[in-house]
Amino acid sequence: MANKINKSSISSSQHLLTKRSTIFWIINSCLIFFFLFMPFQSGLLNGSQPNYEIDILYSFIIGAILLLCLGIYMYRSRRASLVHNPFRYVIWSIPLIYCISMIGAVSAHYSYIEFMIWIFYAILFMTAYHLLRQSDGQQIAFYIYMGSASVIVLFGMMNWFGNASLWGLFPWEVYPDAAMPSSGDVRLTSVFQYANTYAAYLIAFLFACLFTIVVSKNKYVVLFASFMLVPALISFILTLSRGGWTTFPVILLFVLPLLTFSKQIQALFQLILALIASVIMLPSMNSYGLQLQQDHTQGTALLAWIILLGGSLVTAVIAFAFQKYVATRLEQKLQSFNKRKLVMFLIPMLGIVAGIAGAFLLLGNTGFTKLLPASIGDRIENINFNQHSVLERGTFYEDALSIWKDYPIDGAGGGAWQALYQQYQNNPYSSTQVHSFFIQMLVEVGALGMLALFLTLAIVYYYFFKSYLKKTDDEKLMPSIWYIISTAILIHSVLDFNMSYVYLGALVFFSLGAMLSSSEAKTFLWQDKVLSNKLTIVIPAIFIVGAAVYLIMTLVNISGYHSFNTVQKSIQEQNVQQSIEQLDNAISRNGDPEYIDYKLELLTRTYESTLEEQYAIEVQEILDKMSKQEPYYENFIFRQLELNRLLGNDEESAIVSKIAINKYPWEIDYYVEFAKTQFRRAVTAIGEDDLQLANEYLQSIFEIRDVVTAKALELELLPDAQLQGREFGITAKLAMPIGQAFFVLGDYVQAASYLALSWDPAFDDNDDVMAALYYSAVLQKLNQSNEEINNTIFAAFPDTQEDLSAILDGLIGTLPINN
């Protein structure tokens, strides 16, 4: 007979995650360190570069410690922990699918890193779930979030006022763009160095402050939240984020229904109060900020801070007085009205009407925006669907869906968009992010991954709302904060890559775990049997062993990074063999393709200087191996072309260039390389008197020209507001081999028209001299003056004038191959 649950033993076990517990303080210390310190590592952007990756790896150490603490807690209180919501484990389905997607991933390394990141998210989710079931945990987590968000906001304003170093105490060398120049404006970006993501973060913080003001009973907390509301709102405006401005009212509609009708009135009063104060202060904040970034003076900076902090303090006092003296009476008068069904949706509905009116006021020809600083007013007036950021996002999404169609079930693995987008892109833009979290995830883990994500979100939000409606007002504050954070960032992430910042991703999944922790699940049918079974040790054991494995994997990767860093710093002080051995050590521990590319560069340079065949052989062996592990890492194509050039293997170069053109149809450099290779092959064939073969090579150059011309015409069909992206068409570099081909064939008029494009008197490219000589020769053949060109060439290279003159005479004397 199954043993019944011993509720007293379950209750007594809860002390393991309260203030009396060592585990409790270890977990909170890790959370304080992560949420307060790690955002200053560029927000932990997953930027697919070693200098970004190392900070993410250090965060995984925190994750391993948290997972170990969870394992110990769940082992020592396994009977208590098992009566919790069993659906909390659904979060692990997402990293599981990322693991599955690694099997056929287009990038071995970046799919591995993404898998590790999602394990970290799952750990934060589980940590929040267990920690915030205790009131002590709820309170400390709330203070950690509000404190860290306030630091980020104030740090942003420090940068806006021209100096965040605290009088030289912190150099902040990684934050040159915390206030970022953009298209003639300056946009506030704080630690994220990306205005749109900072706007999403600020939306969450703004609404968290609003809820705290109207719900919290702690007067000091209310004062603090009221004080931070104005700096956060001013910062939000200074991001100049049109996406943030347009999603703000949408998120407000998702947030307000959590409050009773009377508290919605209070929240709107506080928001309008802060908005009025912000608009009053905005002209001086804007002008002082722009001035201080150009010329920082202590007196002006002090004045700017006095205005900001003074205005915030006055607003906080008014907000506090309203809550103390007006809100209480408002609650009493509307007490019966609050209980009516659906009344909480009344103000959101009115908000939609107000939003339409506000949009007309701001976007219509009303002159209202003239009251705002010019940079902000112009930005608002330019909000429409026919602007480059909107059109480009539409292109990204369309191209991403094309990728997904080829990898529909489990996706192409982590980092797939960055690896594949150039093969599918509609025009030659450069973007390593899809600018939509959900679509990027669809590309990475396909339908299975999206199913796991939406299942997780559905479970969290279902249980959250189910329990939220039963809570008293005093019990609603903490759950509401985590709902606001996750909802605000996820909604904004539909249109941007906020979740590529691991810090924000961790915050979102911590918030989701916290939301689930506020709910209660019914006892499941087989609970008694599970609690009485020895299998209760399985999950704690998996967590403890998993923590050890996760930590080891992380430390190995960190060790590889530092080995690579050591090689880079000491490359001039040691011989090639020592550097290669250290690189091999780094690569064996961390297979970042950038490490491998650095080794290829070192081997190639060594072969070029020594001509020792062993180095060329090793380069080719590595490239053959990488063609399977990292087939879309573009630098490896350049390394292969470079090796072929050094080996004089033009036939292989032509093959590689053609393959590259198929993979990267909008990368003009591969067309150039193919054309240059085919011209060299034509010259070789002429020297061997195989004129038919030479003609075939030359004709292939014209075919490539026609392909490029046709594709360039496609770009003319883009909407006027959409940017083309990278240069594409008959560029100066491509014009040279085309002109040379016409020159060899004796069509000097055509040759001159193309070689004129490649003529560059700056001579800042290796091919510029030969292009100039060909252009001079073709002008001579057309009986046109080439004296100015010759004088320019010989003046630029006086030491080799005789050699250059001999080459020029040889070209002038060359007869067309068709004669």
Task: Walk through the language-model features, giving the residues of each.
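Transmembrane signal-anchor hairpin modules in multi-pass inner-membrane enzymes, especially those
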Residues: 1-100, 109-113, 133-139, 143-146, ...
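Loop-to-helix entry and N-terminal half of a specific, functionally important transmembrane alpha helix
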Residues: 30-35, 149, 225-232, 274-277, ...
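Membrane helix-loop boundary segments at the extracytoplasmic
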Residues: 36, 40-49, 235, 442-445, ...
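Hydrophobic alpha-helical transmembrane segments
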Residues: 99-102, 140-178, 233-240, 277-286
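Aromatic-anchored transmembrane helix interface
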Residues: 108-130, 143-144, 172-175, 200
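TM-adjacent membrane-interface loops and short helices in multi-pass inner/ER membrane proteins
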Residues: 164, 194, 382-432, 438, ...
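Membrane-interface segments at transmembrane-helix junctions in multi-pass inner-membrane proteins
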Residues: 168-206, 291-309, 437-441
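Hydrophobic transmembrane alpha-helices and their immediate junctions
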Residues: 214-216, 220-224, 447-480, 648
